[in-house]
């Protein structure tokens, strides 16, 4: 899956906004961020072809050990809640599943708070 296909997939999840919130920072113009309920569920580095998504803490060790293309996130992210994904090596279906999972985690958390 290429970057544009991935972007389209994220937007297809519904109620998703995309922004370049770091565009004024050096190198920040290549970091596309996807939001649901006003909160981030995915960071996509357009230059590096990598993605960072939220994940359940109990799933992270197994994914890191067994899933090709899943790696620790950049040092800016908590390894307790986030995983890195290499778009060039991950299986497309796993990429979609992990992205939807991140979307659902964030949406579920913040939809409850709005009620």
Task: Pin down the residues of each PLM region.
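Charge-dense, helix-prone N-terminal extensions
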Residues: 1-115
